[in-house]
Amino acid sequence: MFYEIAKNFYDASSKIGDDAMQNYIKEFGLGSKTGIELPDEAQGVIPTPEWKKEYFRNAPEEGQWQPGDMTNMVIGQGNVLVTPLQMAVGYAGIATGTLPVPNLLKEVRNSSGETVVSREPKKGTMPDVEKAHLEIMRDALRGVAEEDGGLPTMLKQYDYQCACKTGTGEWADHDGYAWFAMYAPYDNPKYVVTCVITEGGAGADAAAPIAAAVMDGCIKLGDGTISGDPAVIEEVTEIIEYAGTGAGRVD
């Protein structure tokens, strides 16, 4: 299914060019630093013909942009590199139409409770995309939560509606990296959660249940309904598999 999607994008590249899709992807912050106040933030890579030529400058025969480069890129494989924070910012952009600038510090208080340092969030940027395209993406991500394999069953235990997507990062000779990204509430987005589990397997199996529980905590904390003391999560000794590939909505 994923390669069928990739083929459609490859066929379109003959009309729109070899880097039009990359330019669109970059509108959502991928391939750029988010601006968070942390040293050595990774920029990531959204490969283009120019990037590949430069990367393989000492091996020109390897630097030629091939049809497979486009098909790999559009499904997140090949030379694509992204961070969980970049994905969170990108999902926020889809949800709200604005890319936030993440920050760690809100304020510092002294021993008397007085605020001595305060930071206002930096103004985000708006991706240069059509509103209709955002609606298509929102609907597709909502469809994953409603229609993809076992995800709807897992999500029914929570009182919120979300938009989400699973993923599995592949690395040769290693188990897959389990990915899951989501935003909620769907009709009034306030929170984004991205979860990555190193060599955790499929995103729907390992990352999705954790992200969904974190999202539930965020929403309850925000509306003041969280109760009880923080729970200590016991060691995970069993993995419950949810049927589905994460490709439930591909239209």
How would you label these PLM feature ranges?
Residues M1-T194, A243-D251:
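Beta-lactam-recognizing serine transpeptidase/beta-lactamase-like catalytic domain environment
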Residues T83-V89, A206-A213:
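Short amphipathic alpha-helical face segments that pack within enzyme cores
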Residues T98, C195, C218-G222:
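Conserved NTP-handling cores and scaffolds of large molecular machines
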Residues T115-K122, I210-D251:
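Short, gly/Ser/Thr-rich active-site loops of penicillin-recognizing serine hydrolases
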Residues T198-G201:
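A generic structural motif
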Residues P127-E130, G203-A208:
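A short, polar/proline- and glycine-enriched secondary-structure boundary/capping micro-motif
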